Curated annotation (Swiss-Prot):
Belongs to the F420H(2)-dependent biliverdin reductase family. Its EC number is 1.-.-.-. Pfam families: PNPOx_N (PF01243). The keyword Iron-sulfur does not apply. GO terms for molecular function: coenzyme F420 binding; FMN binding; oxidoreductase activity, acting on the CH-CH group of donors; protein homodimerization activity; pyridoxal phosphate binding. NCBIfam families: Rv1155_F420. One of its GO terms (biological process) is vitamin B6 metabolic process. It comes from Mycobacterium tuberculosis (strain ATCC 25618 / H37Rv). Homodimer. Coenzyme F420-(gamma-Glu)n binds at residues 32, 37, 50, 56-60, 77-79, 138. Gene3D superfamilies: Electron Transport, Fmn-binding Protein, Chain A. This is F420H(2)-dependent reductase Rv1155.
């Protein structure tokens, strides 16, 4: 598959932050918006987010995997939106399963090392955490300096 070419200024907005607004599609077609913390991998052009199985955004994505993430720049006016088709892991079911391992990698990418990985692993299972991976298929927005 050929690598997509996106505006570097818009990718810089996504890369320069770790908090955005995830938009999913409700059963009636209206958007459902959630503030999320994310990790952007610029080499693979994908965004990853930890979400929980019983939540609306997860149900929405299992029904319709189309999603967008809005990221604001520091100036308050500039922004980038990344769109794609979400891929979801199964919910974490055991402290040593593949989903928990993927969530640990995400945590490390966002925050570094955790003070108690055993506690973290159990929390991922208790919360029924899921890894959302959003390969970016389209980016649009208003880069800094364009207003």
């Amino acid at each position: 598959m050929a690598r997509q070419v996106f505006d570097d200024k818009l990718l810089a907005v996504i890369s320069g932050n770790s908090i955005g607004v995830l938009a999913t599609i409700k059963h009636d077609g209206r958007p459902q918006l959630s503030n999320v913390q994310y990790h952007f991998d610029p080499r693979k052009l994908l965004i990853q987010v930890s979400i929980a199985e019983p939540r609306a955004k997860t149900r929405n994505l299992r029904r319709d995997p189309r999603a967008s993430i809005l990221v604001d720049a520091d100036d308050g006016w500039s922004y980038a939106v990344a769109e794609g088709t979400a891929q979801l892991t199964p919910p974490a079911a055991a402290p040593d399963d593949d989903t928990v391992e993927a969530l640990i990698a995400l945590y490390r990418n966002i925050a570094g090392e955790h003070s108690d990985w055993d506690d973290y692993r159990q929390a991922m299972v208790t919360d029924r955490r899921v890894l959302l991976t959003l390969p970016i298929s389209h980016v649009y927005g208003l880069p800094p300096g364009m207003r």
